[in-house]
Amino acid sequence: MKPMQRLTCLLALCFAASASAKVTMEIPDTIDLLVVNGSSPKLSGGFFDATKKLELEDGEQQIVFRYSPYFSQGNDRIIIDSEVVIATFDAANQELRFDMPKYRDAPQATKAIKTMQWQLLDQQGKAVELRQDRLIKEGMQIGRNFEFETAEYNKKGGVAALTSSMAVQPIAQQEISNATAMAAAEEMLHFWYNKADAETKARFKAFVNQQ
C-alpha cells in the first residue's frame, strides 16, 4: 500500500472512531427531561414509547429534569412530581441510565420525593460523579422557561453550573418567548392526557398517529 493510501486509511479510521464516541442516555417515561446543555433535548423514540434515547457529544454535560413517578388509583393515574433537578457531569463514550428511587404508592412518594436520592449509572453499573442542585422558582409553576432559568443559574455560578463556554451564551428574547410557549403547551398536553380516561386516550393516540 502506498504511503498516501495508508495515511488516508489511518485518517478514516481515526475519524470513524471519533464519530462513534458518543454519550447515550436512556430516558424512562418517569423522567421529564427539560433542558440539556442549555437547549431543549432532542430525544429519539415515539411519543408513547416507555423509554427514549438521548445522544450527546463527549464532554461536560448539564441536564435539567423532573422525576414524575405514577401510580394507579382505580381508573385514575396519580402522578407525583419532584422538584426540578439540575445536574452537571463529565462523560465520554458511555451509556448512562437513571437510577431513581422506587415508591410503594402515591402517599409514600409524596412524603419522600422532596429528599429523593438518585444516580446516573454507566454501562458497568458504576455511579457517575456529578454535581446537583434544585432549580427553584416560587409561585406559579406552569409555563416556566427552563432554558432561561438554567442560563441564569449558570451565570450566578450555582453548585451545578456549567464551567464550559456554553454556560454564558446569550438567549434571544424571541427564543425565550417561543420556548416558554412550547413548554407551557407541552406541559398542559401531558396534564390533560394523564387526566383522560382510557377511551379518550385511545382516540388521542389514533389522532397523533394519523398526523
Swiss-Prot record:
Secretion signal span: 1-21
Pfam family, one: DUF2057
Similarity comment text for this entry: Belongs to the UPF0319 family.
PANTHER family: UPF0319 PROTEIN YCCT
Disulfide bond sites: none
Protein name (database record): UPF0319 protein VC_A0026
NCBIfam families hit by this protein: PRK04517.1
Membrane-spanning segments: none
InterPro entries, alphabetized: UPF0319
Organism phylogeny: Bacteria, Pseudomonadati, Pseudomonadota, Gammaproteobacteria, Vibrionales
Record keyword Signal present: yes
Entry keyword annotation includes Signal: yes
Domain of life from the UniProt record: Bacteria
Sorted UniProt keywords: Signal
